[in-house]
């Protein structure tokens, strides 16, 4: 069965998420308020056992609000890891995260819900990244650090 993904948002980040999801073999539907046939508010009609959701908004707080809304409605969140990214088997990545090309999440690190680990970002060992964080392009987080929720670095 084909994996189904609902992407919420069609801006720059939404298009980036779409590219990654295609490479991972998802069948994709995009919801956005600019599309009268597929507005964001229609997300509940897509909830089923075979469908995952990813809110693709650059605004950290708005993205996490949508994560909570999807969970409260009974939807499942995806976690997307680009094939060229490295996530240690001893790291933990929560739901709703997107790990973009060339990124590294090293051993013992924990990534909270709804985080963006952008192109080429490096998360060294034993880092704690709280919910809703965006690590920007080529960001480096040294080992044993903590990044507070909603931070953009």
Residue ranges and their predicted role:
Residues 80-153:
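Structural signal for interior beta-strand "rungs" in well-ordered beta-sheet cores
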Residues 18, 35-86:
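Phosphate-bearing ligand-interacting subdomains
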Residues 21-22, 67-70, 94, 112-113:
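Short, glycine/charged-enriched secondary-structure capping and boundary segments
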Residues 1-46:
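Hydrophobic, well-ordered beta-alpha structural blocks that scaffold small-molecule cofactor pockets
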Residues 14, 63, 126-127:
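Generic non-transmembrane alpha-helix signal with a bias for helix starts/N-cap capping motifs
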Residues 27, 76, 122:
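Residue-level detector of anion-binding/catalytic polar loops
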